A protein has these predicted regions:
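Structural microenvironment flanking redox-active thiols in thiol-disulfide oxidoreductases
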Residues: 59-101, 113-118
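Boundary of Sec targeting at the N-terminus
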Residues: 19-20, 33
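Thiol-/selenol-based redox modules, centered on thioredoxin-like
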Residues: 130-160
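A short beta-strand-turn-helix
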Residues: 25-45
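Short pre-active-site segment immediately N-terminal to redox-active cysteine/selenocysteine motifs
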Residues: 43-46, 51-54, 124
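Hydrophobic beta-strand anchors of alpha/beta hydrolase catalytic cores
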Residues: 47-48, 80, 128
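Short, internal strand/loop/helix patches
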Residues: 97-131
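Sec-dependent N-terminal signal peptides
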Residues: 4-15
Length: 160
């Protein structure tokens, strides 16, 4: 009976995760303008990565994606959105880091109040989502292991 209940729970959770869309939550962009996360949806699939300046695996993941991004962009039209969850006291460090790391091809957003983090049920960083061109969340993953960025790219390619 417990196995059956677990299976039913897993199926329900699987179906609900596939039907989720990006919430209508406001964040700041690189210029300090307040925008909705939905405004980044433009028909192209994207990787959304939640990170912070104190999270070494976050920075490793974003750098690994950045190293591969030129090759990936030759194969598929996609984008990367880096969402800093640094608070108002440390967001200036996050802004400086996004520029210093050379993440020029990223859309960098700042979730100072962690409203988007809460709305997307992010508890740990790094937390990465794959979102299709319509704003539907199709994949979610916590943590980073070197090489796992290739799995993200495979999932992006599968959306085309």
């Amino acid at each position: 009976m417990k196995k059956l209940m677990f299976l039913m729970f897993a199926l329900v959770m699987g179906f609900s995760a596939s039907a989720q869309t990006l919430p209508d939550v406001k964040v700041e962009n690189q210029e300090g303008k307040v925008v909705s996360i939905r405004e980044v949806v433009d028909g192209t699939p994207m990787i959304i990565s939640f990170w912070s300046t104190t999270c070494k695996p976050c920075i490793m993941e974003l750098n690994a994606i950045n190293n591969n991004l030129p090759d990936w962009l030759e194969e598929v039209d996609m984008k990367v959105v880096a969402v800093s969850v640094d608070d108002a006291r440390t967001v200036s460090r996050a802004r400086a880091m996004t520029q210093g790391q050379g993440w020029d091809d990223y859309t960098c957003l700042y979730d100072k109040n962690q409203d988007l983090k809460r709305a997307m049920n992010v508890s740990l960083t790094p937390h990465t989502f794959i979102v299709d061109g319509s704003g539907n969340i199709v994949y979610s993953h916590s943590g980073y292991t070197p090489g796992s960025e290739e799995e993200l790219f495979e999932k992006i390619k599968a959306l085309k």
